[in-house]
Amino acid sequence: MKLKNKLAVVTGVSKGIGLATVKALLEKGVIVAGWGRTEPEIENPNFHFFQVDVGNFEQVNAAWKATSSKLDMPCHILVNNAGLGYESTFEEMEIGLWEEMFRTNVHGLFYCSKVIIPQMKVMEAGHIVNIASIAGTTGIEGMAGYCGTKFAVRGISQSMFKELRKSGIKVTTINPGSVNTNFFDPIESVNANENMMRAEDVAESIIYVLQTSENYHPVELEVRPLRPKGK
């Protein structure tokens, strides 16, 4: 896809991978609608922020209507990035935290995709990028809830791919390994460090899959740091 002057909706833009993705898209000339809880400090006429909790369908639907009304152009790109994780044994996990993870990581992906897919189907074009995790490929001790959400993201994405390809819509899942962001702030057993990937590395992966040719469909991409424990 040629990215310049296309509209992208990116969720979870306040920090980390979402913020890096917004900046990378803006550098490519993309008009970006950023959906999130807190507005990032971005001064660019092509960036438009819409405050939304993606785990709330009414807010997502309202954000999509506001985006469509303000920008008045079709959406070719959706990056479902919003996500969070909490560390706890399965037995001791608080119900509220469990529900929050599934509401944001899984329901949010469903809600955002649900409101935007119909318009992509009309165009018979579009690309949805779902950010999963290597935690969606193998269980991790103390991270059952988070792993559960990311396994769900991968399964949902595989079904979306099979359903939407016939409508000319690409669906790509990206599974990052450890990334040096504040995602790890509530996780006591892991400290973010320079041996991890940068958020910008994941953003580059997103740009790569978006720029593939029309009949080239990257379905799933796993990216990891080369030396996670240093030299």
Q: Model-derived features: where do they sit?
A:
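C-terminal helical subdomain
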Residues: 169, 173-174, 181, 189-231
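Residue(s) in the substrate-gating loop at a strand-loop-helix junction
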Residues: 133
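Alpha-helical segment proximal to the catalytic Tyr-Lys
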Residues: 118, 158, 162-166
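Substrate-binding pocket helix/loop in short-chain dehydrogenase/reductase
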Residues: 89-90, 97-99
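Active-site helix of classical SDR
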Residues: 113, 149
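Conserved glycine-rich cofactor-binding loop
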Residues: 7, 14-15
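The beta1-alpha1 cofactor-binding region of Rossmann-like NAD(H)/NADP(H)-dependent oxidoreductases
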Residues: 52-62, 95
